Amino acid sequence: AVVARREKCFVVGSESLGDTLCSTPTLKKISNSYGEKFCVATHVPEIFSNNPYVKKVVDIKSFNKNKYDIFETCWSVGKQNSRGIEKKHNVIDIRQFHAIDLGFNLLPEEMECEFYPAPYEDLKLPSNYVCVHPVQTWGSRTWAKEKWEQLINKLTKQGIRVVLLGQDS
């Protein structure tokens, strides 16, 4: 009988853009360790479409686990019990660690988040601009509207054009 070879796949389960970008050093480390590119299933496939360490990008909504050898998400590495922990033992405040450092032993020089955007030659952008994304997934990361306004006004006064990013709504 012929057994179909399944592809290795790394699942980036975060729906937030920032957390997804922070997973890019992990992808590079895994690819270098295994000596091959692999598939990535994610909520934001655009982030990985030109990444040289990724063979194929799959939108997580259409992801079929049966076709892939699953490699854990970077947020679940070392997770022993997905149903929870009955008792607390040796509790550590994990907020002291960077998310991409958990379980992958990344060296400081390996922690740079790399982004490989598609070439946009036809898009004529000014030479000095900054993108501002005032919408966050988590309430604890939300900055007051007044603070965003102050930042944007300060940038504008310095001659820097501001491009606002965010959700459609």
Over which residues does each language-model region extend?
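Catalytic machinery of carbohydrate-active enzymes
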Residues: 1-169
